[in-house]
Amino acid sequence: MRIIVKLFFIIFIFSSLTNADALITKKLENDAQKKYGDFAKNRFISIDEELIKGLKDASEIKKLNVVNRWVNYIKYSSDKKVYKKSDYWATLYEFVGKNKGDCEDYVIAKYYILKELGVSPKKMKFTYVIYRSRSGKKISHMVLSYLKVPNPKSKNDVLILGNNNRRVLPASKRKDLIKVIKMINGDTGPKSKKWKKLEANMKRKKL
């Protein structure tokens, strides 16, 4: 009997730790409701049920398309308006909770959801680009790049997940992205202070 009780206790502790490490937890959903209201809680439930659980067995391409479309429904707003800062990398939780953010926030949200879905971080790059708007204005921008093959030689082997275009397209089809400034390897390469701060905030599920 004691052995059974001990085994049950070990399983319970292990399960609790595993749930705490999940991208979306019940505690997070309830905390989001307290801070932002029912809409925010329902959005996190949607991530967990529709995306993480619903796409678990889907192809990688389908995961990219569905996650990209879901995240792009969030409203665009500058860091100055939302956080009173010129540049701020919001967590997935802040971005979804507030239901607004800028281009980096879309990239961060897509990255972490796709990572939770089993997409290798080595395939995903935070990519700084110059974007040409419909009016012809050149703007600094960030998109998430997905590498179909390691060290791609062709633009057709890089898929772009951006917030200015709701479709996932090969880089060769994104004529509005006129120059790549640099690519960041996410959590697989050298980490900047900004990245380390984001990781710490994600770990504590900062809302």
What spans do the regions from the language model cover?
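Hydrophobic h-region of N-terminal signal peptides that target proteins for export
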Residues: 11-19
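Sec-dependent signal peptide recognition
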Residues: 2-10
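A structural boundary/capping signal
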Residues: 18-207
